[in-house]
């Protein structure tokens, strides 16, 4: 029985005002997906996992993309799909997107499809439909490409890798005792259907500032760019500790801070001027004030999805 295994890293999407556009892959966690072909004479998908994720193929973000690829390309096979979760689910770390990305990469390798990175994103987006009901491209784009990415088009998929000319590290406040059923789906329902022009203009200024800050290596532009007047504010009930953690991050000279994806994790970018220990100490105290136990994870920018070489 032939098998292929791929690894995809966690991600923090949105990055302030880049809702459904920007995302950053990081080394905090990773998912691994192994796909084995049992036979090509029948069609079936059996899922195994170390975590409590749906085991129905159309409801699992790793396997729904495979269903769609096989339909689209007329591939007939019975698969055994092992989803080894390293990324905690439902915490704003791109867990569903990473599973989808690793699965599509492993499948592409197994069937010699040589899918382009854009095609990997296109198919992995089906995984986000399984997990949140919406094909948001940002998490999967970061898990596919690595680094910081901007999804400039979804039909067709076009992803731009953002050159990073500022060296930073990553702190993530991960609230491990928080569980929100179908979190991203619920968070997306909280996004307003209409926005004030002034908020739109400010958010456009922020996203411009963030991208220019990354490219030109300007710390103050990155800090300014990690703000959002619309989506984070609408979702604040999901992470009420966020404003104070952001205040603490700036107090101890972080580069900047924003919500990680749809939350409830919080992302802090740091550099040599930052007192990371004080941020971690006072930030976890803030979580506790809201009856939340935050674990502080240190990470760096991660690379893109990879097929694991089997020894
Ligand atoms: N392979 C998978 N990995 C993680 N979550 C999955 C997977 N398949 C389905 N899900 C479901 O998707 C939801 C987690 O995805 P989501 O809400 O987007 O949060 P996040 O991407 O921040 O982990 C959970 O309800 C989980 O049961
Ligand atoms: N743009 C999406 C990103 C969701 O990221 P996740 O890691 O929380 O799944 C959104 O904000 O809905």
UniProtKB/Swiss-Prot annotation:
The keyword Secreted does not apply. Keywords: Amino-acid biosynthesis, ATP-binding, Cytoplasm, Kinase, Nucleotide-binding, Threonine biosynthesis, Transferase. Transmembrane segments: none annotated. One of its GO terms (cellular component) is cytoplasm. Its EC number is 2.7.1.39. Pfam families: GHMP_kinases_C, GHMP_kinases_N. It is found in: Cytoplasm. One of its GO terms (biological process) is threonine biosynthetic process. Gene3D superfamilies: 3.30.230.10, GHMP kinase, C-terminal domain. Pathway: Amino-acid biosynthesis; L-threonine biosynthesis; L-threonine from L-aspartate: step 4/5. InterPro entries: GHMP_kinase_C_dom (IPR013750), GHMP_kinase_C_sf (IPR036554), GHMP_kinase_N_dom (IPR006204), GHMP_knse_ATP-bd_CS (IPR006203), Homoserine_kinase (IPR000870), Ribosomal_Su5_D2-typ_SF (IPR020568), Ribsml_uS5_D2-typ_fold_subgr (IPR014721). Its main location: cytoplasm. ATP binds at residues 88-98. One of its GO terms (molecular function) is ATP binding. It is an enzyme of class 2 (transferase). It catalyses: L-homoserine + ATP = O-phospho-L-homoserine + ADP + H(+). PANTHER family: HOMOSERINE KINASE (PTHR20861:SF1), HOMOSERINE/4-DIPHOSPHOCYTIDYL-2-C-METHYL-D-ERYTHRITOL KINASE (PTHR20861). Belongs to the GHMP kinase family. Homoserine kinase subfamily. NCBIfam families: PRK01212.1-4 (NF002288), thrB (TIGR00191). Catalyzes the ATP-dependent phosphorylation of L-homoserine to L-homoserine phosphate. This is Homoserine kinase. It comes from Saccharolobus islandicus (strain L.S.2.15 / Lassen #1).
